[in-house]
Amino acid sequence: MAKAGKKYQDACKLVEAGKFYTAAEAMELVKKTATKKFDETIELHVRLGVDPKYADQQVRGAMVLPHGTGKSKRVLVFAKGEKVKEAEAAGADFVGSDEIVQKIQGGWLDFDVAVATPDMMGTVGRLGKVLGPRGLMPNPKLGTVTMDLTKAVSEIKAGKVEYRTDKAGNVHCPIGKASFDAEKLQQNFQALIDTLNRVKPAAAKGQYMRSITVSATMGPGIPVQL
């Protein structure tokens, strides 16, 4: 534990107290603070000037990062008939209908994202208490309830990420891995910031973006200029 603590302290020393870094500087620095033996995820944390208690101030959606997240996601598709072949051809890891529902009811959850055709949602709805709390329930707003399974699965495999405000109005989202080039991290960072600005709720008052921080999985937060 002491060794891990020292590595974290050394990483903290790289971050100048009170300084706000440019996006380019922050991406170079966050790579240096990723000192673990595994390929740490680089995360973006944005504090927004919204009150998520109100439905018209909630920020939620999905987007494809230009360079993906560096993580391969296991995709489950709820479908039947011809749509099964489409999902399989698109690269879905698991495809099925009632038998998959029964499997999940039995405790199986070895997937990262679930997609469903609209006609399957009546069946999938029975899994609400299992999938809902885990953020795995297909949602039309996120593009995971759709007839275009080719597009949905392809985008997820290409690095589609979901973003949403927590109870405090913060958005936490991965933008890549420590092994990524700083330039690719910056392009992913900018794409997500641009998206958050584009989906600003009309009801949000005052300053929208309050703070931006990036960090590696086990590293300190690095403040970024607004």
From Swiss-Prot:
Keywords from UniProt, A to Z, are: Repressor, Ribonucleoprotein, Ribosomal protein, RNA-binding, rRNA-binding, Translation regulation, tRNA-binding
What would be one Gene Ontology cellular-component term for the protein? large ribosomal subunit
Biological process terms from the Gene Ontology for this record are: regulation of translation; translation
Q: Which SUPFAM superfamilies match?
A: Ribosomal protein L1
What are the cysteine partners in each disulfide bond? none
| PROSITE patterns according to UniProt | RIBOSOMAL_L1
Entry annotated with the keyword Ribonucleoprotein: yes
Q: Drop me one GO molecular function for this one.
A: structural constituent of ribosome
UniProt keyword tRNA-binding, yes or no: yes
Range of residues in the leader sequence: none
Q: What does this protein do?
A: Binds directly to 23S rRNA. The L1 stalk is quite mobile in the ribosome, and is involved in E site tRNA release.
Quaternary data:
Part of the 50S ribosomal subunit.
Q: Which family does it belong to?
A: Belongs to the universal ribosomal protein uL1 family.
Could you tell me what this protein is called?
Large ribosomal subunit protein uL1
Q: Which organism is it from?
A: Selenomonas ruminantium
